[in-house]
A protein has these predicted regions:
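Hydrophobic alpha-helical transmembrane segments of membrane proteins
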Residues: 1-74, 93-456
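Short helix-to-coil transition segments within interhelical loops
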Residues: 79-88
Length: 456
């Protein structure tokens, strides 16, 4: 048996706890039966479905994230990282072992719900929805643990605020669909719901199960790679690139006109741009990281350069490749492009805008200080992208695109066919200025870093 899984079972399970859970659930079932004796089967199904969601999604998610936080706060995470377990063994051992007691109660609730649904209508549909809820919950746990490991700073004793925010986002995004899936009226027909996925026209339950399985696969991939990073197992960022493309492919299936042409490439580009910001603000991009990249580029094989490279350039390069493919597959003539004027120009502007924002982030990240650059970056983007253009637009509307190139979209609303020259010239000016500032920051901090290294 997996040693990490066995250790978590030893911590979570005991004969007393194993006996308490079914006893409490039996009392809850008795209460539900007493409150609604006319239709006890439906009441039991609804009540224990809600309990299933509460135990697995709510309590189980807290246990999964706490399994990492407790290791860090109790100073045992370093011992975990020195174990002989592979990243995959450590990952699934923690994933299923830390929430084993919550899953014990959740599976008991699911069993009661299935028995209560035996004599009801569309029994198999209810079972499929419960399966969707279980698979989606495991996917949620995998994504939560992966995000916590991705943002983990072992030098800090306090839990990461970013991890807490990611936990809230994932919990909200996953809990609501799971509740909908489990409590959906089984007497209603299995409609298409969100629309046919990739034009297959599957029933909503089967479609949701397929999407949940895909998200689970991507979550396990992210968890395995994040655990490998914490265990100091070097790897090239192929898993990140595959995850970004896989998530974009899942989303592209719900597009109004899904296909392997322009709609797919546009969705992949948007997903890659979003992941660029995610990697930028959750990873360390300080001077030491880029010094390691430059060192390996000069003295090591290419593989070591890829291993040391942060993830945001990978996402940005993926977005650029997808935009090139979008342009080559007649993206400007697609149905979506006809509905949104100058969509191709807006996408290229978004690509350059993302590169500019990454440069602003690095201007603050390359400082010789321990202060995190996130707050100053967001403040700069707000002032540069909202406050100053809004002030200038009231007096001189033509100057607003020079401060925020996306203000050139106003020309599209007025019937123009493109963003206008001022928007593109403004973006070019931004890139030149930001590149100069980053180069100055790098050269200004290099002597200080060199002196501190020699002193050590």
């Amino acid at each position: 048996m997996n040693p990490e899984f066995k250790r978590n079972l030893w911590l979570e399970m005991s004969s007393t706890r194993l006996a308490i859970m079914p006893g409490v659930l039996a009392l809850i079932g008795l209460l539900v039966y007493v409150l609604n004796p006319d239709d006890p089967q439906r009441s039991l199904f609804v009540a224990f479905s809600v309990l299933f969601v509460g135990l697995t999604v709510g309590w189980g998610s807290l246990l999964v994230v706490s399994s990492i936080n407790n290791e860090v706060s109790e100073r045992t995470w370093d011992q975990q990282r020195l174990s002989a377990l592979s990243p995959w063994d450590m990952a699934w051992g923690k994933l299923f072992g830390s929430a084993a007691y919550a899953w014990y109660g959740g599976l008991l609730c699911a069993l009661v719900a299935v028995v209560a649904a035996l004599s009801g209508p569309v029994f198999w549909s209810r079972c499929v929805w419960l399966l969707v809820g279980a698979v989606g919950t495991v996917a949620l746990h995998a994504w939560l643990m992966a995000s916590r490991l991705h943002t983990l700073d072992i030098r800090s004793e306090k839990a990461s605020g970013m991890a807490g925010r990611l936990f809230g986002v994932f919990l909200v995004l996953q809990t609501l669909p799971v509740i909908f899936m489990v409590l959906r009226d089984p007497s209603s027909p299995d409609r298409e719901g969100l629309g046919s996925w990739w034009g297959w026209g599957l029933p909503l339950s089967i479609q949701s199960l397929l999407v949940a399985l895909l998200l689970l696969a991507l979550g396990l991939l992210a968890l395995w790679r994040s655990m490998g990073k914490q265990l100091m197992v070097r790897g090239v960022p192929w898993a990140w690139a595959l995850g970004v493309l896989g998530l974009g492919w899942v989303i592209a299936g719900f597009m109004p006109a899904p296909g392997w042409g322009a709609p797919l490439w546009m969705t992949l580009a948007c997903t890659a741009l979003a992941s660029t910001y995610g990697a930028l603000f959750t990873e360390s991009n300080n001077r030491l990281v880029w010094q390691a990249v430059l060192y390996h580029r000069a003295y090591s094989p290419v593989r070591r350069v890829w291993q040391a490279l942060p993830l945001w350039p990978v996402s940005w390069a993926l977005a650029a490749v997808c935009l090139v493919a979008y342009s080559l597959t007649e993206g400007a003539a697609s149905e979506t492009a006809r509905e949104v004027p100058a969509l191709q120009g807006l996408m290229w502007m978004a690509l350059l805008h993302t590169l500019r924002d990454c440069g602003i982030y690095h201007f603050f990240a390359l400082r010789n200080t321990n202060r995190k650059p996130t707050a100053m970056t967001l403040l700069t983007l707000f002032v540069l992208g909202v406050v100053l253009p809004a002030l200038v637009a009231s007096a001189a509307p033509g100057l607003a695109p020079w401060l925020e190139p996306f203000f050139g979209a106003k020309a599209l609303a007025m019937g123009e066919a493109s963003l206008g020259a001022s928007a593109w010239l403004g973006m070019a000016l931004h890139l030149v200025v930001v590149a100069g500032l980053v180069a100055w920051r790098w050269s200004a901090g290099a002597p200080v870093a060199l002196r501190s290294t020699r002193a050590d």
